[in-house]
């Protein structure tokens, strides 16, 4: 099974509503590697690495988000394996500081 890496940027009401915690929880349930962080422009950015089916599923879940969020736009692009190095040592999935 090959690993794919995707980076997403999510816009809408996605900060201050538990969106990052939702993404981290969903990613861990799907056994994905990566990270999630807020951006100063009000969006949320995430990187996911894992089997194609699981990555597609997490992106679908990101489009929905938690009930308190309202996603208006999700941009997806290929990600870099090197970007996984941003995770905290020893963690498969990390919530990173705001960028």
Curated annotation (Swiss-Prot):
Keywords for this protein: Hydrolase
For this protein, the record's PROSITE patterns field holds:
ACYLPHOSPHATASE_2, ACYLPHOSPHATASE_3
SUPFAM superfamilies recorded: Acylphosphatase/BLUF domain-like
Q: Name one Pfam family in it.
A: Acylphosphatase
EC number(s): the record gives 3.6.1.7
**Which class of enzymes does this protein belong to?**
hydrolase
Catalytic residues, chain numbering: 20, 38
- Positions of the Acylphosphatase-like domain: 5-97
Family the UniProt entry places it in = Belongs to the acylphosphatase family.
State the protein's name: Acylphosphatase
Tell me which species this is from.
Rhodopseudomonas palustris (strain BisB18)
Query: Gene symbol?
Result: acyP
């Amino acid at each position: 099974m090959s690993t794919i890496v995707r980076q997403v940027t999510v816009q809408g009401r996605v900060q201050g509503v538990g969106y990052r915690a939702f993404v981290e929880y969903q990613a861990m349930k799907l056994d994905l590697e990566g990270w999630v962080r807020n951006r100063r422009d009000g969006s949320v950015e995430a990187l996911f690495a894992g089997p194609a089916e699981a990555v597609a599923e997490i992106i679908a879940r990101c489009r929905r988000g938690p009930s308190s969020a309202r996603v208006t736009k999700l941009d997806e692009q290929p990600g870099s394996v090197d970007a996984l190095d941003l995770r905290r040592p020893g963690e498969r999935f990390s919530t990173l500081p705001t960028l």
